[in-house]
């Protein structure tokens, strides 16, 4: 059962393969992005992020991160162009972060770790719903954005202010009118490669689009993330920190860059 996995010594990423053998597959994520070997591909289009009618619904602690969930019943918020064919709908975003500011991201750049990483998860509308999309190699497009320590982010402020209400696993709170555009950097240059979900079931259904330019987050804002709990209410407190999977082997994949 997938609720057995986590990020501790006993149930963490090193052990996921026992229950999810695809953990050792050929297109696992995250990966280290070696900027020396990533190839500029002039055929890659700029990303088209159409979040103008976006409708956020709730914020939820699922016991391994927290998700901000969106209404994906229509094309309210879509990602297209870039390396993608067709249109991909935003369903949720979540973060991965560390126990300290020196680690937390899942992807790394020339082995450098960032303090956190934002994943905006989109599914290919040609498959009808998220559950069907994950069964296909082009089912999902995940936009990955690094967070580096610096000035506080206005976009993140609304999120950090809501976290106290979802401290423990299973808690959910209304979270309307959040504009995910507030979490995008000014420059949308990206790296792209074929990969997987970074949490079980680790399905190899993701076109990864990792932005080169990080957004900033203050140490104070990061401290709110680290007050969340992996556990449910009434259980022994386990702080939600280091919920990141380390870089996986690239195997025969190539990482392409949209920029020179």
Curated annotation (Swiss-Prot):
One of its GO terms (cellular component) is cytoplasm. Keywords: Acetylation, Cell membrane, Cytoplasm, Lyase, Membrane, Metal-binding, Phosphoprotein, Zinc. Interacts with SLC4A4 and SLC26A6. Interaction with SLC4A7 regulates SLC4A7 transporter activity. Its EC number is 4.2.1.1, 4.2.1.69. Disulfide bonds: none annotated. One of its GO terms (molecular function) is zinc ion binding. It comes from the Eukaryota. The modification N-acetylserine is found at residue 2. Residues 3-259 form the Alpha-carbonic anhydrase domain. This is Carbonic anhydrase 2. Catalyzes the reversible hydration of carbon dioxide. Can also hydrate cyanamide to urea. Involved in the regulation of fluid secretion into the anterior chamber of the eye. Essential for bone resorption and osteoclast differentiation. Contributes to intracellular pH regulation in the duodenal upper villous epithelium during proton-coupled peptide absorption. Stimulates the chloride-bicarbonate exchange activity of SLC26A6. It is an enzyme of class 4 (lyase). Substrate binds at residues 198-199. The active site is at residue 64. Pfam families: Carb_anhydrase (PF00194). Belongs to the alpha-carbonic anhydrase family. PANTHER family: CARBONIC ANHYDRASE (PTHR18952), CARBONIC ANHYDRASE 2 (PTHR18952:SF120). InterPro entries: CA_dom, CA_dom_sf, Carbonic_anhydrase_a-class, Carbonic_anhydrase_a-class_CS. It is found in: Cytoplasm; Cell membrane. Inhibited by acetazolamide. The modification Phosphoserine is found at residues 2, 87, 165, 232. The record marks 7, 62, 67 as: Fine-tunes the proton-transfer properties of H-64. Zn(2+) binds at residues 94, 96, 119. One of its GO terms (biological process) is morphogenesis of an epithelium.
């Amino acid at each position: 059962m997938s609720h057995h996995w986590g990020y501790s010594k006993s149930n963490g990423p090193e052990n996921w393969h026992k229950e999810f053998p695809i953990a050792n597959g050929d297109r696992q994520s995250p990966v280290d992005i070696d900027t020396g070997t990533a190839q500029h591909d002039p055929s890659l289009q700029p990303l088209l992020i159409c979040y103008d009618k976006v409708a956020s619904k709730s914020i939820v602690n699922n016991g391994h991160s927290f998700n901000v969930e969106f209404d994906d019943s229509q094309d309210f918020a879509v990602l297209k162009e870039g390396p993608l064919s067709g249109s991909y709908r935003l369903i949720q975003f979540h973060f991965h972060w560390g126990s300290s500011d020196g680690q937390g991201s899942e992807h790394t750049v020339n082995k450098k770790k960032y303090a956190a990483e934002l994943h905006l998860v989109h599914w290919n509308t040609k498959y009808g719903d998220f559950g069907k999309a994950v069964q296909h190699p082009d089912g999902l497009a995940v936009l990955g954005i690094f967070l580096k320590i610096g000035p506080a982010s206005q976009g993140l402020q609304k999120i950090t202010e809501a976290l106290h209400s979802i401290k423990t696993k299973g808690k959910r709170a209304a979270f309307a009118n959040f504009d995910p555009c507030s979490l995008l950097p000014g420059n949308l240059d990206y790296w792209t490669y074929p990969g997987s979900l970074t949490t079980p079931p680790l399905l190899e259904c993701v076109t990864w689009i990792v932005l080169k330019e990080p957004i900033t987050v203050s140490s104070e804002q990061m401290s709110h993330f680290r007050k969340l709990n992996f556990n449910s209410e009434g259980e022994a407190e386990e702080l939600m920190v280091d919920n990141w999977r380390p870089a996986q082997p690239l195997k025969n994949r190539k990482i392409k860059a949209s920029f020179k």
